[in-house]
């Protein structure tokens, strides 16, 4: 009598991986053409939004006056109306909470003009005149220094992109995968900037730093996907894709979760701006990496173009 073969019991980790792959199988069923088309449409819409409504520059990039006020029994709108009525200066006010002391206060922003120091004194004196117990601290950012910071921020983004492009191309040595990764990073930044414009988040040195961090996050996930597909150990492209997606989704969702918690507990305007930019940038990266880049790579691997490039490289 023949002995029956014993069924190998699946490990819990294998079962979890199999469940993930079933949930993400809808991505495999998408046509490569549609995977490329949908993110391109989103990118074009974001580019149009940027053309119409680019994020406003913050005080640290365009210069101006920031007056921080504590111990004032008034709302931001009431204080802004009073300052405008008293000085004739068009100001904007917002409430904040100091992360160190826990005290609540109001920040008043005034645009940069010919004499920012004089404007700061006028606003401070007007507040002290009505609110005797107010703790008023003015800060002046000269427009010249704002322009310098703006130029340095633009240079930092350009140099980061050039450095990233060189490293990616040297690593893969293929124009199509390398170009797709570079475009995905660019698209993430465009979508993040468009979101800033819609939500009214100002472009500051802090948000520029967030955009630079976004380049690193984008390249990580795209290199993971591209490496898995081009140098795959699995039997099929679909298996390699699902393996990369399950790993990449875990990486990105944990980062998104941490950023969301940071945004919830933060009382700093700077941290709030950074986290919002990164959250929307990473959401865009989900689409650009696992749909757009995957669609391009699936087409590229199946096309004769890859074979001709390999022949030229092998000569």
Swiss-Prot record:
Keywords: Cell membrane, Membrane, Protein transport, Translocation, Transmembrane, Transmembrane helix, Transport. One of its GO terms (biological process) is intracellular protein transmembrane transport. It is a multi-pass membrane protein. Its main location: membrane. It is found in: Cell membrane. The keyword NAD does not apply. GO terms for cellular component: plasma membrane. The chain crosses the membrane at residues 35-55, 152-172, 181-201, 205-225, 242-264, 282-302. InterPro entries: SecD/SecF_arch_bac, SecD_SecF_C, SecF_arc. Part of the protein translocation apparatus. Forms a complex with SecD. Belongs to the SecD/SecF family. SecF subfamily. Involved in protein export. This is Protein-export membrane protein SecF. It comes from Thermococcus gammatolerans (strain DSM 15229 / JCM 11827 / EJ3).
